[in-house]
Curated annotation (Swiss-Prot):
PANTHER family tied to this protein: ACID-SENSING ION CHANNEL 1 (PTHR11690:SF170), AMILORIDE-SENSITIVE SODIUM CHANNEL-RELATED (PTHR11690)
Name of encoding gene: asic1a
GO biological process, one term: cellular response to pH
Domain of life: Eukaryota
Disulfide bond sites: 98-199, 177-184, 294-369, 312-365, 316-363, 325-347, 327-339
Protein name from the UniProt record: Acid-sensing ion channel 1A
Residue positions with a glycan: 164, 370
Lineage: Eukaryota, Metazoa, Chordata, Craniata, Vertebrata
PROSITE patterns in UniProt: ASC
Complexes and interactors: Homotrimer. Heterotrimer; with other ASIC proteins producing channel with different properties. Interacts with asic1c.
Main location: membrane
Recorded catalytic activity of this chain's protein: Na(+)(in) = Na(+)(out); K(+)(in) = K(+)(out); Li(+)(in) = Li(+)(out); Ca(2+)(in) = Ca(2+)(out)
Parts of the chain on the Cytoplasmic side: 1-54, 461-501
């Protein structure tokens, strides 16, 4: 019987890959303008070359405009918006006042003179009265009794206690006080220490919610009459940081979240005048980097709950003095020891003056992103008038000369119940950049985002087709090399099987 032959040869599988349409077909179906005239079915003509020039020129202009827009975006420009908003109620600002004389002469004791007499420029290094020929007789008598140190045993001296005890008392300075027509008291002023010593803040917000104004104009804010007590001023026989050539008070109007920085930001008010301060609240909003340079992170200070330039400066000055003098001044926060009078004179005052005037790099305080400040307009009238001086002298049991030299009135009020907003805004964002680029794409080459997707889709199909064809050819060649003789007869199979029986 003739055996049959079974052909067991394995043929490679032929995979059919979809070939992408020709470039001419894609060009005539694409939404990209102009390429249908470039990739045409006809031979290359002058018309085709012109379309190539037009298309490449448009593409060049498009790239130029896109680069310009991207560069403008990377400059992170901003615009400033100014607006005025009316409101029925406004929080009244904090008002800090400081007498320009920080130490009352009558409150100085023998122990004070022993420790701080040289700092106050009253005594020399030998504990003797300086410039005795300039001293008035009444002052000299007081100094003689207090500078007899022959049997004196000095006691402990603390600068904070000294400033607190000898500073002007608001109960003695405040002759009258009204807020929105209602009387206010010395207890409505909280004590705060500054470089001027013991100062006072009205409406600080520390003991309760801050007071508000419901109407603008004079008589709807704070009106105080003060006695600056010039007879308590330290006699000046030389220049020192603790003595003042001026008479009056320093005033700062600020928000409740901002500590007073009155030696740098305050304005002066002189005796013998009524000073009207018309305020308008300004709310400033700045942008952080890269559009601006404001500080948007929480404060790193251990002493202040909110970041402000005043808080940053105070914190920085404190660190500077602790590092250079190993102590702090009375108005500075923290737990470092207070400077002694010797350190005040030899280290603290010179170091702080140097920091304020020259070393601006050490205290680099960024602008906060949100600021509340108050613009001010000041006007003055003479007080007292000839008609009122006798009445005031009788009312307060003072001489007419004393009233003229010491009494002043400060009137702080809102101009109107509105506030001004000054806000920085991003001038060019991602949406604007995409809109400009999309508009230019439509103008120059008639393209959109979907057109770009069409191009990528066609390129993807072409790349996939070429890669798959290349892979299939390699696979076909490998199969031909390894399976060149895979054909067996049925007799060979039977012979192979019989060996196992």
């Amino acid at each position: 019987m003739k055996t049959s032959v079974m052909d067991l040869k394995v043929e490679p599988m032929d995979i059919d890959f979809d070939q992408p349409p020709p470039l001419q077909v894609f060009a005539h179906t694409s939404t990209l303008h102009g390429i249908s005239h470039i990739f045409s079915y006809e031979k290359i003509t002058a018309k085709c070359c012109l379309w190539v020039v037009f298309f490449l020129s448009s593409l060049t202009f498009l790239m130029y405009v896109c680069i310009d827009r991207i560069q403008f975006y990377l400059e992170y420009p901003h615009v400033t918006k100014l607006d005025e908003i009316t409101t029925p109620v406004m929080v009244f600002p904090a008002v800090t006042i400081c007498n320009l004389n920080s130490i009352r002469f009558s409150r100085i004791t023998r122990n004070d003179l022993y420790h701080a007499g040289e700092l106050l420029a009253l005594l020399n290094s030998r504990h003797e009265v300086r410039e005795a020929h300039l001293v008035e007789e009444s002052v000299m008598e007081v100094l003689k009794s207090k500078t007899d140190f022959r049997s004196f045993k000095p006691r402990h001296f603390n600068m904070w206690e000294f400033y607190n005890r000898t500073g002007h008392d608001i109960k003695d300075m405040l002759l009258s006080c009204q807020f929105r027509g209602s009387p206010c008291r010395p207890e409505d002023f909280s004590v705060v220490f500054t470089r001027y010593g013991k100062c006072y803040t009205f409406n600080s917000g520390e003991t309760g919610p801050p007071r508000v104004s419901v109407k603008g104009g004079m008589g709807n804010g704070l009106e105080i009459m003060l006695d600056i007590q010039q007879d308590e001023y330290l006699p000046v026989w030389g220049e020192s940081d603790e003595s003042s050539f001026e008479a009056g008070i320093k005033v700062q109007i600020h928000s409740q979240d901002e500590p007073p920085f009155i030696d740098q930001l305050g304005f002066g008010v002189a005796p013998g005048f009524q000073t009207f301060v018309s305020c308008q609240e300004q709310r400033l909003v700045y942008l952080p980097a890269p559009w601006g340079s404001c500080k948007s992170t929480p404060p790193s200070s251990d002493y202040f709950r909110a970041y402000s330039i005043s808080a940053c400066r105070t914190d920085c000055e404190t660190r500077y003095l602790v590092e250079n003098c190993n102590c702090r001044m009375v108005h500075m926060p923290g737990d470092a020891p207070y400077c002694t009078p010797v350190l005040y004179k030899e280290c603290a005052h010179p170091a702080l003056d140097f920091l304020v005037e020259t070393d601006s790099d050490y205290c680099s305080c960024e602008t906060p992103c949100n600021i509340t400040r108050y613009s001010k307009e000041l006007s003055f009238v003479k007080i007292p008038s000839k008609a009122s001086v006798k009445y005031l002298a009788k009312k307060y049991s003072k001489s007419e000369k004393y009233i003229t030299e010491n009494v002043m009135v400060l009137d702080v009020f809102f101009e109107a119940l509105n506030y001004e907003t000054i806000e920085q805004r991003k001038a060019y964002e991602v949406a604007g950049l995409l809109g400009d680029i999309g508009g230019q794409m439509g103008l120059f080459i008639g393209a959109s985002i979907l057109t770009i997707l069409e191009l990528f889709d066609y390129l993807y199909e072409v790349m996939k087709y070429r890669l798959c064809r290349c892979s299939n050819k390699k696979h076909h060649n490998n199969n031909n090399n390894t399976d060149h003789n895979a054909v067996f007869s049925l007799d060979d199979v039977n012979c192979h099987v019989s060996k196992f029986h």
